[in-house]
Amino acid sequence: MQKLKLHGFNNLTKSLSFCIYDICYAKTADDRDGYITYIDEQYNANRLTEILSETCSMIGANILNIARQDYEPQGASVTILVSEEPVDPGSIDTSEHPGPLPESVVAHLDKSHICVHTYPESHPEGGLCTFRADIEVSTCGVISPLKALNYLIHQLESDIVTMDYRVRGFTRDINGVKHYIDHEINSIQNFMSKDMKALYHMMDVNVYQENIFHTKIMLKDFDLKHYLFNARPDDLSAEERKAITDLLYKEMQEIYYGRNLPVL
């Protein structure tokens, strides 16, 4: 897409939001409590602040304010307001390709924010535990928040991720013509690295005429040892391993497709 010559500031708002899920099996009530405690410490407000601050540093954004909070009995939230320095729009790469990992990258944001909220949960029946992190990166300017997608998913390795990207509003060029998007995009998948795509099943639901893009991903490979908390597969009988595997797989399928499946 040819770069636009704008009249004034780029008024398009670009928002990327995604839910990251981690699934676990904890057999006893003590194990479930232990998982919640572990995940709450692993993703507390301080750790999340470090991740989001590194995101800002990686893309060259200036942090204006940080608000963070840990909650009782569990969960945390962090919101960072950021702004940009003057930048030449001609130097900004808006092509459709995977975003960077933490390397030498320059980008700028204005009137923008990055926020994350965490939701650990478990149920007393069945032994299933889930951890959900909701992340939103919203920018107003020439930069797409999709550039941060690749890094954030690498930082928060998870079983299932649902992503939504939307461009809102319009901006005018020097001739007064309104533009409702300023970069080419066919799929969020095109902003993900090859190694990440190799790990996940992927599905798109896009509404191109509304500039709304939705992608779901779920890990391809299932290894039971990665889903047991405070236990090993060798500690379980073959029947127990199969029952737990079926339970976890059903849970992941339901979250991925967003609907409850019948009990077989």
Swiss-Prot record:
Stretches assigned to coiled coil: none
Positions of modified residues (Pyruvic acid (Ser)): 112
Site (Cleavage (non-hydrolytic)) location in chain: 111-112
Needed co-factor(s): pyruvate
One Gene Ontology MF term: adenosylmethionine decarboxylase activity
PTM note: Is synthesized initially as an inactive proenzyme. Formation of the active enzyme involves a self-maturation process in which the active site pyruvoyl group is generated from an internal serine residue via an autocatalytic post-translational modification. Two non-identical subunits are generated from the proenzyme in this reaction, and the pyruvate is formed at the N-terminus of the alpha chain, which is derived from the carboxyl end of the proenzyme.
Functional description taken from the UniProt entry: Catalyzes the decarboxylation of S-adenosylmethionine to S-adenosylmethioninamine (dcAdoMet), the propylamine donor required for the synthesis of the polyamines spermine and spermidine from the diamine putrescine.
Protein name, UniProt field: S-adenosylmethionine decarboxylase proenzyme
Species: Sodalis glossinidius (strain morsitans)
Gene (name only): speD
